[in-house]
Amino acid sequence: AAARQMLEAAAAARWSVPVAEVQAVQHEVLHRATGRRFGFGELAVDAAKQKVPAIGELRLKDPAQWHYIGKGRVGSVDMAAIARGQATFGMDVRLPGMVYAVVARPPVVGGKLRSADRDAALKVPGVLKVVEIAGFSGAAAFQPLGGLAVVARNTWAATQGRAALNPQWDDGANGSYESVAFRREQERLVKVPGTVYRNSGDAAKALSDAPAGKVFTAEYYVPHLAHATMEPPVATVQIQGGKAEVWTSIQNPVAARDAVAARLKLKPENVKVNVLLLGGGFGRKSKPDFVDEASIVAQAMPEGTPVKLVWTREDDIQHDYLHTVSVERLEAVIDSQGQVRSWLHRSAA
């Protein structure tokens, strides 16, 4: 209601008419006397500058004016197509002359390829090419992990070619990482003071002064977790005539466009991203590393060849950018009425 009134006020100010003469209806603000109208988007900046109405100033709609509330189910544009298997997800893309790619990535983040049997991969029927993908420099920061892409006429040939590579890796600095030992260190750190992000009062004193039996302590561990999206990452890239076109299930198409433009040294306006149904994202598909991988492989193929780069479920679990591992320790004082009187929360992540 507050946003509606602010939009109406912005429109009235533009038209220099009393706000009582305008009305927000179905994504527009109308001036019925003259037939003038503004879309909400046209008014958004001006509306944001309006004074936010106080609770007592809000004008709620009469139920007779409701368009959706109480009117039964609101239809979904693509629900029927999804239910019938007719909707297009990233894995569904089919283009003339398309080839398929999978990537052998290092088993440890930051690892480097030591050797691989490229000839064995190329002997697999249907395999067309082996393309090297350089690893990142500096922090990983959601960049491609590097490795060897096997390009083939179908995904089966690509995965069989990848298996034939038999890659050997140098694990690098992260090779000694061990999650159990890291958890023990987090459990140690979470019991001692650290950087304070918020403090109100003296929680530590309240805990020490609390009567016996009134202090409750709990500790929680969140391990490395893959996002495990229903559809693993997949992207198709075609480069032709100084332009690139992308078909992918992505949460951040602008990031995908910019990554491809940077990789191929193109202007952003020369990269088109077709956003397909997501198949689950959970934040994972806000990062365009898999689209970047596809653009690297497409660049190595004859111009105009559409390349679909596929992550298998195994790729997704092993090479996902995992959720942050953390240990959370909470201590609280609960009074006789069951109310929280003090709360201390420490996090090691």
Language-model features: locations:
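Structural alpha/beta core scaffold segments of enzyme domains
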Residues: 1-349
